[in-house]
A protein has these predicted regions:
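Catalytic domains that recognize anionic headgroups
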Residues: 1-261
């Protein structure tokens, strides 16, 4: 997000909702009915390249508008090294402009907490994200009715969580058993992506029900993709930089712009 987007949001006083589908693969989104529907009403970016094939550096780059080699978060382990006094984040710009700012995510390492009025970390092994985030959209609607602009960051972590439990924990990057079962890996991922489609459909319906499209900019992104065993040596993400992890998607939805790709 560059300075022009920050100015557009503040000058027109639109709400901002960012939804990150953690581990969302571009090839699945291109074939998905739910994501194709998003493309019909958004500016769709099908050639987005993530800054890093893992969550924290990718999202730190997004929220700060700067790559990790400058902002300090250039490694999976460098969230704490983010130069928060040198790089003002989108959250801080909006907070300074009077926005109510709220983040809901599975780890406090995902993005800087500076500028957030509320920064909630949920238990990814227990949470019902469809219900939880539905409730948050309802909460934001109440803010909007009180003439309070808001910035809501929602992190959909369910793909990541199941891959962590089913792939990252039992296997390593050289486990022949994993790479020998490509069809099983594909099915596992496709089942998880299908649930993310249901989540996106729910979220869209909720935003429609509360009439928030007109007064909001909605950005739906993937932080990185996930391997299903394409290349021996990478069972999930973060080891290599092939298309299946670094090519992501972004859907920019605003009543100010017509849909296009």
């Amino acid at each position: 997000l560059n300075l022009n987007l920050k100015l557009l949001i503040v000058m027109k006083k639109k709400n901002l909702i960012i939804v990150c589908i953690d581990g969302g693969r571009l090839d699945r989104a291109l074939k998905s009915k739910a994501f194709k529907h998003l493309a019909t009403k958004s500016i769709f970016f099908p050639q987005t390249i993530t800054y890093a094939p893992y969550t924290n550096s990718a999202i730190h780059a997004l929220i700060s508008g700067c790559y990790g080699n400058r902002n300090g978060c250039f490694s999976y382990w460098h969230s704490i090294k983010f130069k928060k006094f040198e790089f003002k984040t989108l959250t801080e710009y909006l907070h300074d402009a009077g926005y109510y700012t709220y983040a809901d995510l599975h780890s406090d390492l995902v993005l800087p907490n500076s500028g957030f009025d509320e920064f909630e970390v949920f238990d990814e092994s227990l949470v019902d994200l469809k219900q939880r985030h539905s409730n948050l959209i309802e909460k934001m609607k109440a803010k909007n009715e009180d003439n309070q602009n808001f910035f809501l960051y929602l992190h959909y972590s369910s793909i990541h969580t199941e891959i962590m439990n089913s792939v990252l924990k039992p296997y390593n990057n050289y486990s022949e058993e994993y790479f020998a079962n490509r069809k099983l890996n594909e099915k596992r991922y496709d089942d998880l992506f299908r649930i993310s489609e249901e989540y996106i459909e729910m979220l869209g319906k909720k935003i429609t029900d509360f009439n928030l499209w007109k007064d909001s900019i909605v950005l739906i992104i993937s932080d990185h993709g996930i391997s299903v065993g394409e290349k021996f040596g990478e069972r999930a993400y973060g080891a290599f930089c092939y298309d299946y992890t670094i090519k992501t998607f972004a859907y920019y939805i605003s009543s100010d712009f017509e849909a296009k790709e």
